């Protein structure tokens, strides 16, 4: 498709399914804000975030109505994807209203594997090469997802509505789990109880500890990618979203979407990065091994469910290439 064709007037009625599912998620979490408002640090700010997002979506839709073209319709997707950056930290605000369950998941790892894989993995592969390789994979998370969604928008436009729905709906399903299942992950839990205690198999319950404590273990910086990952965690990470791993889960959903494009270059270029990313979730202490394993299988379940749901809601959907 030529560049000028993206600006040719052509009105497509209705919302993106991504817009609809975002509005539903915003409504759902607004109800949660109302329920937990007494325990939340800044419920007014959370509501304001939703008002601003709604206003931005309205402005983007209004611009499209004034000059309907494919370029502006694609542009409407941008705030939906950027919204994930704001919705993620809120899972901590919600889940910290409940006692944390890290002792349960650390015990599961100990029972299944006879050790704490998160503590041993980076000791077994401690060289700068492996540290940088795994951190590179972890840091590529958002770039992989962004590349896949952009490929659909510009290379498989007629399939983009379904792909975007599957992607965002799966993300929101993970977020909903996190809002009710408080698990901080080993980088926070082992900092709280002590690495020595974890190595000896002592996993005390910490209750509401993470309501007021967000300190985490900081691994040694061995190169540019480990520095980038640590910097990103310092800015946006919270004691939340450990089980099941959305890094494994959503990268798996992304790989399945990439496969569905039938563009093998897209899939196979990302595949080794995907493997490094999955390993990195345990290597950098972000997840217990059971988190990552369950993240993989949860992704398959969510992908199948959201695909089925989309087909039910859009029985006449056109899946031809464009």
Spans of features found by a protein language model:
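Hydrophobic, membrane-inserted alpha-helices
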Residues: 28-31, 56-60, 144-149, 249-256, ...
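Aromatic-anchored segments of alpha-helical transmembrane domains
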Residues: 25-34, 83-88, 171-179, 274-283
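Membrane-interface helix-boundary motifs at transmembrane edges
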Residues: 10-11, 39-43, 63-75, 152-162, ...
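Interfacial segments of alpha-helical transmembrane regions
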Residues: 74-79, 146-181, 187-201
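Membrane-embedded catalytic cores of phosphoryl/pyrophosphoryl-handling enzymes
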Residues: 223-322
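Central hydrophobic cores of alpha-helical transmembrane segments in multi-pass inner-membrane proteins
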Residues: 50-65
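N-terminal transmembrane-helix/juxtamembrane module of multi-pass inner/ER membrane proteins
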Residues: 2-52, 71-146
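Membrane-interfacial catalytic/cofactor-binding modules of polytopic membrane enzymes
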Residues: 180-260
